[in-house]
């Protein structure tokens, strides 16, 4: 059969192509397909896909990876916004920073008006202005506070207050002369030149004096208490007490009034003659004075009551 096929092939090649029938072509095509399929499946081994090792991020790992990527994206956006804000505030340009300068000596110089909330200078640092120019510090409807430890200087619209637990001292930076100090053991307390009054809630000192050509005025809105551990001595050419309420003098031993004592009766309350003596809850007294200046009171129990009572402290003189 093979010899016949070879002879037919030789005859076909020598005599030209031989036409095949439809059946022969179909059989030939089927044989070619079988041979092709057998060659394709020669090295194929079927394997269960579920038993293969899976690669990549799947399940929870995939979700976690997505969250990390989103978080990194948000951080990048925030970093970009902060960078743009810093760029706009500091004004960094081709010529450098337009708002400030950094020097090798450690000096930081601001070249324009700067808006800051809190400034923390370094150890032994100085905040100042340029030569022949003022350093202007303003607060937007808020006080300006300089604080170091417990010492605080507050500058407000209507007042300036200084708070310190260890004292304070003012001196001239050029001459180094002390203008004002609360170190009473070393320096005597003097008001600075131009200061007319000192407003304090409580003062503890050995002596309060005024200049020889000026008066010493002590004024309070409410109640004033002057207390001394070993007595209170008030000396002056003229001593006047003006008060809207009562004046109370207390002493363990005695109260001595030296000099001329004058009491203005026009300021003392008086009762009309039509008032009944001892009526109601009122108790009336008459103010009396001895020849040596001792004051005492006598209860008014009726009309024409004088100071001649048996238990007066004046003795035989009234």
Curated annotation (Swiss-Prot):
<keyword id="KW-0735">Signal-anchor</keyword>
<feature type="topological domain" description="Extracellular">
    <location>
        <begin position="87"/>
        <end position="318"/>
    </location>
</feature>
<dbReference type="GO" id="GO:0042383">
    <property type="term" value="C:sarcolemma"/>
</dbReference>
<comment type="similarity">
    <text>Belongs to the sarcoglycan beta/delta/gamma/zeta family.</text>
</comment>
<feature type="glycosylation site" description="N-linked (GlcNAc...) asparagine">
    <location>
        <position position="258"/>
    </location>
</feature>
<feature type="disulfide bond">
    <location>
        <begin position="288"/>
        <end position="314"/>
    </location>
</feature>
<protein>
    <recommendedName>
        <fullName>Beta-sarcoglycan</fullName>
    </recommendedName>
</protein>
<keyword id="KW-0472">Membrane</keyword>
<keyword id="KW-0206">Cytoskeleton</keyword>
<keyword id="KW-1003">Cell membrane</keyword>
<dbReference type="GO" id="GO:0007517">
    <property type="term" value="P:muscle organ development"/>
</dbReference>
<comment type="subunit">
    <text>Cross-link to form 2 major subcomplexes: one consisting of SGCB, SGCD and SGCG and the other consisting of SGCB and SGCD. The association between SGCB and SGCG is particularly strong while SGCA is loosely associated with the other sarcoglycans.</text>
</comment>
<dbReference type="InterPro" id="IPR027659">
    <property type="entry name" value="Sgcb"/>
</dbReference>
<keyword id="KW-1015">Disulfide bond</keyword>
<feature type="disulfide bond">
    <location>
        <begin position="290"/>
        <end position="307"/>
    </location>
</feature>
<dbReference type="InterPro" id="IPR006875">
    <property type="entry name" value="Sarcoglycan"/>
</dbReference>
<feature type="compositionally biased region" description="Basic and acidic residues">
    <location>
        <begin position="21"/>
        <end position="32"/>
    </location>
</feature>
<feature type="glycosylation site" description="N-linked (GlcNAc...) asparagine">
    <location>
        <position position="211"/>
    </location>
</feature>
<dbReference type="GO" id="GO:0016012">
    <property type="term" value="C:sarcoglycan complex"/>
</dbReference>
<keyword id="KW-0812">Transmembrane</keyword>
<feature type="topological domain" description="Cytoplasmic">
    <location>
        <begin position="1"/>
        <end position="65"/>
    </location>
</feature>
<feature type="region of interest" description="Disordered">
    <location>
        <begin position="1"/>
        <end position="32"/>
    </location>
</feature>
<dbReference type="Pfam" id="PF04790">
    <property type="entry name" value="Sarcoglycan_1"/>
</dbReference>
<feature type="glycosylation site" description="N-linked (GlcNAc...) asparagine">
    <location>
        <position position="158"/>
    </location>
</feature>
<dbReference type="GO" id="GO:0005737">
    <property type="term" value="C:cytoplasm"/>
</dbReference>
<keyword id="KW-0963">Cytoplasm</keyword>
<keyword id="KW-1133">Transmembrane helix</keyword>
<keyword id="KW-0325">Glycoprotein</keyword>
<dbReference type="GO" id="GO:0005856">
    <property type="term" value="C:cytoskeleton"/>
</dbReference>
<comment type="function">
    <text>Component of the sarcoglycan complex, a subcomplex of the dystrophin-glycoprotein complex which forms a link between the F-actin cytoskeleton and the extracellular matrix.</text>
</comment>
<feature type="transmembrane region" description="Helical; Signal-anchor for type II membrane protein">
    <location>
        <begin position="66"/>
        <end position="86"/>
    </location>
</feature>
């Amino acid at each position: 059969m093979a010899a016949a096929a070879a002879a037919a092939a030789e005859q076909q090649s020598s005599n030209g192509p031989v036409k095949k029938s439809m059946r022969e072509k179909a059989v030939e095509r089927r044989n070619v397909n079988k041979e092709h399929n057998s060659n394709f499946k020669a090295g194929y081994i079927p394997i269960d896909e579920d038993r293969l090792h899976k690669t990549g991020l799947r399940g929870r790992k995939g979700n976690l990876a997505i969250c990390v990527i989103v978080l990194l994206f948000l951080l990048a956006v925030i970093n970009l916004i902060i960078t743009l804000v810093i760029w706009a505030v500091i004004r960094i340009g081709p010529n450098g920073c337009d708002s400030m300068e950094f020097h090798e000596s450690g000096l930081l110089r601001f070249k324009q008006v700067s808006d800051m909330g809190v400034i923390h200078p370094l150890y032994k640092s100085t905040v100042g202005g340029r030569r022949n120019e003022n350093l202007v510090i303003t607060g937007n409807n808020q006080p300006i506070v300089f604080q170091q430890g417990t010492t605080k200087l507050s500058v407000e619209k209507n007042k300036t207050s200084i708070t310190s637990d260890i004292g304070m001292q003012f001196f001239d930076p050029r001459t180094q002369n002390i203008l004002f100090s609360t170190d009473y053991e070393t320096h005597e307390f003097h008001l600075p030149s131009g200061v007319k009054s000192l407003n304090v809630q409580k003062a503890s000192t050995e002596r309060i004096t005024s200049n020889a050509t000026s008066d010493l005025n002590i004024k309070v809105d409410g109640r004033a208490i002057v207390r001394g551990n070993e007595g209170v001595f008030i000396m002056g050419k003229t001593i006047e007490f003006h008060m809207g309420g009562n004046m109370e003098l207390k002493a363990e031993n005695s109260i001595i009034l030296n000099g001329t004592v004058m009491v203005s009766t026009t300021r003392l309350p008086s009762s009309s003659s039509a008032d009944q003596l001892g009526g109601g809850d009122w108790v009336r007294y008459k103010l009396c004075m001895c020849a040596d200046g001792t004051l005492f009171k006598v209860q008014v129990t009726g009309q024409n009551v004088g100071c001649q009572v048996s238990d007066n402290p004046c003795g035989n003189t009234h």
